[in-house]
Amino acid sequence: MNFLRRRFSSGDLQGEANEKEDPPNVGILNFKKGPSPSAPNSPSKSASPATIGQKLFSGTVGVKPVSKDRYKTLLVIDGQHTDWSKYFKGKKLFGDWDVKVEQAEFSELNLASNSETGTTVEIQAIRNGNKTTRSLKPDFLLIRQHVRDAKVDWRHLLLGFRYGGVPSINSLTAEFNFLDKPWVFAQLIDIQKRLSKDVFPLIDQTYFSNHEEMLNSPKFPLVVKIGHAHRGLGKIKVDNVQTLEDLASVMATMSSYATTEPFIDSKYDIHVQKIGTNYKAYLRKSIAGNWKANTGSAMLEQIPMDERFKLWADECSQLFGGLDVVSVEAIQGKDGRDHIIEVNGSSMALLGEAQEEDRRLISEMVMAKMQMMCKPAQQPLSKASSSQSITPQANGAQKPVLAASPSRQAQGRPLDTSAQATPGQARGPPSSGGLPGVSNSQTPLSNQPSHLSNPPPQPFPTSTSGPQGLPRMASKDEEDTMKNLRKTFAGIFGDV
């Protein structure tokens, strides 16, 4: 009996089945181990190539890597009196991109621009007594300093930013047009001609390319503006011909143009500003009695915005392709008449107690522009081609069967497993182990070649078998087990 127990042990039976490589025994083990796989598995492999491909695809493409460099660099060109970084703190672009604020003055910048790689800026600044140098690639510009003034001209930096295609507020095209005040005034003349002098009251101004023609000025007193300057620089009040002659002799030593306009005995200056869709208007009057209200001590008062001032700002904001930040400067004479004298861009002065609000408005406009103009380049998926080739394999389960076919053919096994399907299996969809290169839906059992119609039965259960396929499979496995037991009994009693 002990001999019979040893002979009837499952280990011996499995050993005989493995030595003979009888497919039914393999089918019994697979059937008892777990649920039916979606595609036939090779007896020597536990995972099909399709399963491996699915795991590989989901691991490489499904998980989106997080980059540490998810930020855009904003370069603010302004003095150190204002810390612009606090107005962008905590703000995000495109959902999760940070805004890195770099602030410097024009005098601290050097740059190099390439048509392919863009603009690289080097900042050499002195902070807390220490000289610091850092490099960056700006994605956006906010220009709060005058590009050109009485003693400086930073147009070479402006050209470099334009060469690298760096967007800005206002646009670099607009900033370049603001390099000469007579050029801007010429645009205002066009607006006046279109709207009439009553609607757009531009001051009467005369341009001189050099000093020679200045002596033919009409009447006095007048104001002479030499070259391009801000904050009251380059302006002089002339009361008579002798003073004008002296001024003309000084201009002979300079290669600069000049403009003249009648002197207006003013009550106050008018400052109208527009930041996006926000409007403000101020009155400014000199306390010291200086005819230049923007120099020395002055009284400032914010006044309600009327439709006339709003029209001025709207018309000027359309200059040079559009100005996001613009101000209109005017004076009102003691006769009650208004005179528009100039327009400024993004470098305009912020006045009054609303300066913090104005800076927040500018920062919000910068964020909106960056959101629109600084969209990150879409990263190409490195696994795009592999995903297209792996996905059909996982869905159709065709490639795993083909990959296992050479090894099975080398072991003397048939190529097809679906031709000898049981009647229960034939009612459901055909198995995925059909003819190579032909989809399951287009390969009915009756159309298979005759030389593949009688292969040995394959016990691999499939997920595409009909509901009656599993009982048929189980009964067939039991018959195969009984055959093995008969062979074992015959061997035992034959030896006895």
Swiss-Prot record:
<protein>
    <recommendedName>
        <fullName>Synapsin</fullName>
    </recommendedName>
</protein>
<keyword id="KW-0770">Synapse</keyword>
<comment type="similarity">
    <text>Belongs to the synapsin family.</text>
</comment>
<dbReference type="Pfam" id="PF02750">
    <property type="entry name" value="Synapsin_C"/>
</dbReference>
<dbReference type="InterPro" id="IPR013815">
    <property type="entry name" value="ATP_grasp_subdomain_1"/>
</dbReference>
<dbReference type="InterPro" id="IPR020897">
    <property type="entry name" value="Synapsin_pre-ATP-grasp_dom"/>
</dbReference>
<dbReference type="InterPro" id="IPR001359">
    <property type="entry name" value="Synapsin"/>
</dbReference>
<feature type="compositionally biased region" description="Polar residues">
    <location>
        <begin position="442"/>
        <end position="453"/>
    </location>
</feature>
<feature type="modified residue" description="Phosphoserine; by MAPK">
    <location>
        <position position="42"/>
    </location>
</feature>
<feature type="modified residue" description="Phosphoserine; by PKA, CaMK1 and CaMK4">
    <location>
        <position position="9"/>
    </location>
</feature>
<feature type="region of interest" description="Disordered">
    <location>
        <begin position="1"/>
        <end position="51"/>
    </location>
</feature>
<keyword id="KW-0966">Cell projection</keyword>
<dbReference type="GO" id="GO:0042995">
    <property type="term" value="C:cell projection"/>
</dbReference>
<keyword id="KW-0597">Phosphoprotein</keyword>
<feature type="modified residue" description="Phosphoserine; by MAPK">
    <location>
        <position position="36"/>
    </location>
</feature>
<feature type="compositionally biased region" description="Low complexity">
    <location>
        <begin position="32"/>
        <end position="50"/>
    </location>
</feature>
<feature type="compositionally biased region" description="Polar residues">
    <location>
        <begin position="379"/>
        <end position="396"/>
    </location>
</feature>
<dbReference type="GO" id="GO:0005524">
    <property type="term" value="F:ATP binding"/>
</dbReference>
<dbReference type="InterPro" id="IPR020898">
    <property type="entry name" value="Synapsin_ATP-bd_dom"/>
</dbReference>
<dbReference type="InterPro" id="IPR016185">
    <property type="entry name" value="PreATP-grasp_dom_sf"/>
</dbReference>
<comment type="function">
    <text>Neuronal phosphoprotein that coats synaptic vesicles. Plays a role in the establishment of functional synaptic connections and in the regulation of their activity-dependent short-term plasticity.</text>
</comment>
<dbReference type="GO" id="GO:0007269">
    <property type="term" value="P:neurotransmitter secretion"/>
</dbReference>
<dbReference type="Pfam" id="PF02078">
    <property type="entry name" value="Synapsin"/>
</dbReference>
<feature type="region of interest" description="Disordered">
    <location>
        <begin position="377"/>
        <end position="482"/>
    </location>
</feature>
<dbReference type="GO" id="GO:0046872">
    <property type="term" value="F:metal ion binding"/>
</dbReference>
<feature type="compositionally biased region" description="Low complexity">
    <location>
        <begin position="428"/>
        <end position="441"/>
    </location>
</feature>
<dbReference type="GO" id="GO:0030672">
    <property type="term" value="C:synaptic vesicle membrane"/>
</dbReference>
<dbReference type="InterPro" id="IPR011761">
    <property type="entry name" value="ATP-grasp"/>
</dbReference>
